[in-house]
Amino acid sequence: MTTTTQSEQDRVIIFDTTLRDGEQCPGATMTFEEKLNVARMLDDMGVDVIEAGYPFASDGDFEAVHEIAKRSKNSVICGLSRAAHKDIDRCAEAIKPAERGRIHTFLSTSPVHMKYKLQMEAAQVYEMVISSVTRARNHTDDVEWSAEDATRTEFDFLCRCIEAAIKAGATTINLPDTVGYAVPEEYRELFRKVRETVPNSDKARFSVHCHNDLGMAVANSMAGVAGGARQIECTINGIGERAGNAALEEVVMAMRVRQDKLPYWNRIETTMLTHASKTVSAATSFPVQYNKAIVGRNAFAHESGIHQDGMIKNAQTYEIMTPETVGVKGTSLVMGKHSGRAGLIHKMEELGYKLSRNQIEDVFVRFKALADRKKDVYDEDIEALVDEQLLHGQDQIKLMSLTVIAGTHGPQRATMKLDVDGQIRIEEAEGNGPVDAVFNCIKALVPHDAKLELYQVHAVTEGTDAQAEVSVRLSHEGRSMTARAADPDTLVASAKAYLGALNKIVAKRQRSVREDAPTVAVAG
């Protein structure tokens, strides 16, 4: 957050594109409810601009952007659009309910993109820049234009396009490092030279959008700001296409911790960063790497004796920020089988969750069941319970019961009962091991041709009674769907995770039946 002594000139707008560029990451597809949940969290956290999706891509994307626009209280709601007029008009319709809406239109400007992707001459691209921005400006005063693959674009042509876009009404100019090719010094110089060369550059805010292909997305983002950009486009956990995007939590904390070298400020409530990371991880079923900066499990862990000794004497010996600054409060052992509804509600609020009365009741029932099986219920256990309720509460296929017979000799056999859209089904199946038997049972109960791409297990907490958290990724018709589930029984968690991915496939198929939009390429 900021103080009254900080100038508006040094403010950096945080533009979150988790719901658009982040969701383009293979396997990271989110359901409608998951998108609403993530958007609400971003809005509460102080994100200035939420790029909520690509309305022309599908009816599902349109509906999500439209609903987020209706519900947002603080953030500008932005929709992405190609340079085509029909895309822009659809985007305008999607963001219409927003108190403050933005249209973000883009066009490739690099020689390789113009020749092979657009198959257009530079003169045609130049005219389309003017046409698209003008069209968008007819709908809203807040228009962003992106020169896709700006870092591989000829400088003179880039400046001409930027000047034309600003003259046509663009209020934000984004120069994305689409393929993660730039290095910090040249990216800083690009912004400095563009702002120095383009005669009307003072009429627009400049923006960075960096991909992490060479591991320099955050460094490049900060370099762009040093060169004069005042908007950073980023995603929670750095998710995105290929190697991902600049991570929101990293750019925000870089500005917070290194004010001596990065004298800029933003409006993000940093104590929500860890919760935001976990929310997006749960929605996408993408685990956060243990050594991830700021929000990783080991970000504030110290194992070596020398480090521990230093921490005991003075935390500043090995910590450049406090865990509390980013919302890490440490694991607590206060919850158990004697805890009541009020205690659970308080704990969930402490962890950053806001649930409806029905959702609270469902979580409480499962919490009591877990507490009967587990001596201590950690914060991570409660987060797993809540995430499962939020992500799988509306599933059409639900696990009712599971029995597995396994041993060193003889067949591994699973018996399962499912509720499939209100219909109870029971089946028994064998497999090459208990997990294989469980998955074969699901295939027998719900016939499908999805292929298993990933099966991963790790413990939510420590100890032999820890919940197992299982991630499953299924591939179907060229799309990957990932789901995650937790349970003290690894096989139950495995079944729930598999069913979670299958439910996403079912939901996607149902949306596809209703949709009749062409497949479209999106900006990076």
Curated annotation (Swiss-Prot):
Q: Which InterPro entries match?
A: 2-IPM_HCS-like (IPR050073), 2-isopropylmalate_synth_dimer (IPR013709), AIPM/Hcit_synth_CS (IPR002034), Aldolase_TIM (IPR013785), LeuA/HCS_post-cat (IPR054691), LeuA_allosteric_dom_sf (IPR036230), LeuA_bact_synth (IPR005671), PYR_CT (IPR000891)
Q: What is its EC number?
A: 2.3.3.13
What are the GO cellular component annotations?
cytosol
- Pinpoint the Pyruvate carboxyltransferase domain residues: 12-274
EC top class named in words: transferase
Q: What cofactors are annotated for this protein?
A: Mn(2+)
State which pathway it belongs to. Amino-acid biosynthesis; L-leucine biosynthesis; L-leucine from 3-methyl-2-oxobutanoate: step 1/4
What residues bind Mn(2+), as annotated?
A: D21, H209, H211, N245
Query: What's a Pfam family this protein contains?
Result: HCS_D2
Q: Which UniProt keywords apply?
A: Amino-acid biosynthesis, Branched-chain amino acid biosynthesis, Cytoplasm, Leucine biosynthesis, Manganese, Metal-binding, Transferase
What residue spans carry the region label Regulatory domain?
398-524
Family designation:
Belongs to the alpha-IPM synthase/homocitrate synthase family. LeuA type 1 subfamily.
Q: What does this protein do?
A: Catalyzes the condensation of the acetyl group of acetyl-CoA with 3-methyl-2-oxobutanoate (2-ketoisovalerate) to form 3-carboxy-3-hydroxy-4-methylpentanoate (2-isopropylmalate).
What protein does this entry describe?
2-isopropylmalate synthase
The organism is: Rhodopseudomonas palustris (strain TIE-1)
Name of the encoding gene: leuA
